[in-house]
Amino acid sequence: MARTDDDTWDLATSVGATATMVAAGRARATRDGLIDDPFAEPLVRAVGVDFFTRWAAGELDAADVDVPGAAWGMQRMTDMLTARTRYIDAFFAEAGAAGIRQVVILASGLDARAYRLPWPAGTTVFEIDQPRVLEFKAATIAQLGAEPTAPVRAVAVDLRHDWPSALRQAGFDVGRPAAWAAEGLLGFLPPQAQDRLLDNVTALSADGSQLVAEVFANTGASGDALNAAGEKWRRHGLDVALDDLGFPGERNDPASYLQQLGWQPVRTPLNQMLANNGLPLQSTEPGAPFAQNYYCTAVLNKAG
């Protein structure tokens, strides 16, 4: 079913289910010794989508559930999440080393960095997402007996609404630099909402703030690859619709847009990240799915 501008979800439906899928990929990468996210598998189990639970537990074989030779699937996603998780973990470590003590995770989903990363003393982590998502994650992690490694402030608001006011009310200090993460987010926003998000991040950011974002091109080829993978997964028990979750239409290139706002962006193509981690590359043939995907880090310098 096509998205609407004010749709909502939990972690077993719509966009929320993609957060569970991503956590399943992190759990699989953790089982393979590629990353260390001990919270991913129990969070996926608690959501209760059987296909993702079996994925997280290592009970599914990629050779059985993936389309042979396809650009997307369980194994491809596990590889990508390995590279992505390492990249963003390193981003936060570098931001902390630079003295940044405010962290904002946009559309945090089942991200558990507030519990698994060694944050410097004085750091506060702000997590922004839909109320049902944040409530579920907090309750599940509390049942595990885990404590955050830095104070966590939940900001329960839709990013298409007035989240800047909610963030400030939660104690965010616009006079101090922040480290922002937009992981797996921008492609799920309407084009104009993507621009508003980056405008708001800029308005809230003091000089020296840093941002990391995943840029996922919503091309016809990438959509076809995602839909083909989803269809194969449904034949193996997936009962959640994962197609048509993005918003079609032309949109501004995030790195170029950020540069116009005073940020100094650096692009890292997806294949470079995969190569840096010794993982199989995606095709770069013209029109190939995901060939345009990249990761962007940026530092704000409003003074120019």
Curated annotation (Swiss-Prot):
Disulfide bonds: none annotated. Keywords: Methyltransferase, S-adenosyl-L-methionine, Transferase. Its EC number is 2.1.1.-. GO terms for biological process: methylation. The keyword S-adenosyl-L-methionine applies. It is an enzyme of class 2 (transferase). It holds the Pfam family LCM. One of its GO terms (molecular function) is methyltransferase activity. S-adenosyl-L-methionine binds at D129, D158, L159. The keyword Transcription does not apply. Belongs to the UPF0677 family. NCBIfam families: mthyl_TIGR00027. Exhibits S-adenosyl-L-methionine-dependent methyltransferase activity. PANTHER family: S-ADENOSYL-L-METHIONINE-DEPENDENT METHYLTRANSFERASE YKTD-RELATED, S-ADENOSYL-L-METHIONINE-DEPENDENT METHYLTRANSFERASES SUPERFAMILY PROTEIN. This is Putative S-adenosyl-L-methionine-dependent methyltransferase MAP_3385.
